[in-house]
């Protein structure tokens, strides 16, 4: 795990899961994608701040649980430096806590799910259409199972009639 790093930036001073817990998620995603070196910035922000970011970058004027920004290498930056950095993940812990309560999920399980979701976005996965969503969700389910976490979409699938 020495070659995997999460830079924690906690602007919200909100309690977050242990760094080891989230590093385990990064390790799983990295192993699955044969990545031996990776670095991610994890920004912990308030609901107000994530709402501003959501409005600015996604044109949605509401708080969200996570936003990921895949790293785009600037011209001239050496590959050996650029290849390790995956991007930035912004999480609003208060949104995660509310979702976990509403969905009757353990908070640390939900954190791990959402963090893995964000990491997959940094690797190019998306859910703009049903086919992309199915691929991404299936991978999330598989990775979470390795952590002993149940399928987070079961309740949602029952509600959506999937």
Curated annotation (Swiss-Prot):
It is an enzyme of class 3 (hydrolase). Zn(2+) binds at residues 117, 121, 127. One of its GO terms (cellular component) is cytoplasm. It is found in: Cytoplasm. Pfam families: YbeY (PF02130). One of its GO terms (molecular function) is zinc ion binding. Its cofactor is Zn(2+). InterPro entries: MetalPrtase_cat_dom_sf_prd (IPR023091), YbeY (IPR002036), YbeY_CS (IPR020549). One of its GO terms (biological process) is rRNA processing. Keywords: Cytoplasm, Endonuclease, Hydrolase, Metal-binding, Nuclease, Ribosome biogenesis, rRNA processing, Zinc. It comes from the Bacteria. Binds 1 zinc ion. Its EC number is 3.1.-.-. Single strand-specific metallo-endoribonuclease involved in late-stage 70S ribosome quality control and in maturation of the 3' terminus of the 16S rRNA. HAMAP family: Endoribonucl_YbeY. Belongs to the endoribonuclease YbeY family. This is Endoribonuclease YbeY. It comes from Francisella tularensis subsp. holarctica (strain FTNF002-00 / FTA). The gene is ybeY.
